[in-house]
Amino acid sequence: MSVYDKHQALSGLTLGKPTPYHDRYDAALLQPVPRSLNRDPLGIHPDSLPFHGADIWTLYELSWLNNRGVPQVAVGEMHLNAESLNLIESKSFKLYLNSFNQTTFDSWESVRATLANDLAHCAQGDVSITLFKLSELEGQPLAGFTGECIDDQDIQIDSYDFNADYLATNEQDAPVVEETLVSHLLKSNCLITHQPDWGSVQIHYRGKRINREALLRYIISFRHHNEFHEQCVERIFNDIMRYYQPEKLSVYARYTRRGGLDINPWRSNTAFNAPNGRLPRQ
């Protein structure tokens, strides 16, 4: 369980409540969640972030009317800088996008600029938006995380409660390595509704070798944990830094879509490329 799931800052969210749908443009539908809610308990301060990164969103259900009344459709890609004051609550994002459905825009650029302006205002941070025609995406192959998958270890799991102390199981004389580890067993739950969130996570680091059994147990322990996607990734980054102090660390998670949106946060303390390739479950 999160220590802040009843915080006053969350009380006004539409998430988990019956909500009418609007098909006329309304930027006020967007709702922010302060990043400080999970960062403060982790000791992460906005003036000295231990990482850089972004939340990459894919917008699959985006439509509007052109100036002749003909519906237009696109797939959108948003990159929200991790230095923003707020993350964007996903149900409100879905409702906001739905408000474009019967709204007329003069051009694709007008749609893109409107999205970028509204989302940056809500998040209080830098946002980039790209819109793709469906023909630009046809035939694209499924992607995969590079790295060694740790999921096939022959271990016994008896607890599914979050426990960062699994990472305390490390070798004092472990050699320094640089490697990339991958797990597809990340599952957490929405902070508010407790609906399941399914994801894959890639961890690239340089430092003392991470105990792979300990890491897998740690990842599986998120199974009953209630936090938003972005918060889980920052918790993973913070916990690995706390227990292993790697020289370099990058954590990238890609979650399955819900409500026409998928969220793919990454955090890193080094140069890192986060390709937005769709994984098999996405």
UniProtKB/Swiss-Prot annotation:
Compartments (UniProt record): Cytoplasm
Does Phosphoprotein count among this protein's keywords? no
MF-aspect GO terms: preQ1 synthase activity
Q: In which pathway does it act?
A: tRNA modification; tRNA-queuosine biosynthesis
UniProt: substrate binding residues: 88-90, 229-230
Q: Which residues form a coiled coil?
A: none
GO CC list: cytoplasm
Positions bound to NADPH: 90-91, 258-259
Q: Name one GO biological process term.
A: tRNA modification
Sorted alphabetically, which Pfam families does this protein's record hold? QueF, QueF_N
Write the Enzyme Commission number(s) for this entry: 1.7.1.13
According to UniProt, the reaction catalysed is: 7-aminomethyl-7-carbaguanine + 2 NADP(+) = 7-cyano-7-deazaguanine + 2 NADPH + 3 H(+)
Keywords in alphabetical order, please: Cytoplasm, NADP, Oxidoreductase, Queuosine biosynthesis
Q: How does it assemble?
A: Homodimer.
Summarizing the function annotation, the protein's role is:
Catalyzes the NADPH-dependent reduction of 7-cyano-7-deazaguanine (preQ0) to 7-aminomethyl-7-deazaguanine (preQ1).
Q: Which family does it belong to?
A: Belongs to the GTP cyclohydrolase I family. QueF type 2 subfamily.
- The protein here is known as NADPH-dependent 7-cyano-7-deazaguanine reductase
